[in-house]
């Protein structure tokens, strides 16, 4: 049986929390801010927690983290 390998693209984008959740940076933050309101830009700062149903899928890809 071959070793389980971490999906490297996902490992660079997501961090595992102490309780087993996953956090990541917000999407839509690289350019085209003139089309976003001040409130949208403010809320895009920081990190986001991944939905619990999606965490199960990504946990397999990030099994070795």
From Swiss-Prot:
Compositionally biased residues, Basic residues: 1-16
Gene Ontology terms, MF aspect: structural constituent of ribosome
UniProt-listed Gene3D superfamilies: 4.10.410.60
Ribonucleoprotein as UniProt keyword: yes
A GO cellular-component term linked to this record: cytosolic large ribosomal subunit
Key words of the record: Ribonucleoprotein, Ribosomal protein
InterPro entries tied to this protein: Ribosomal_bL35, Ribosomal_bL35-like, Ribosomal_bL35_CS, Ribosomal_bL35_sf
Disulfide bonds: none
Region of interest (Disordered), residue spans: 1-24
GO biological process: translation
Pfam families the record matches: Ribosomal_L35p
Family, as annotated: Belongs to the bacterial ribosomal protein bL35 family.
Designated name of the protein: Large ribosomal subunit protein bL35
Organism in which the protein naturally occurs: Leuconostoc mesenteroides subsp. mesenteroides (strain ATCC 8293 / DSM 20343 / BCRC 11652 / CCM 1803 / JCM 6124 / NCDO 523 / NBRC 100496 / NCIMB 8023 / NCTC 12954 / NRRL B-1118 / 37Y)
Gene: rpmI
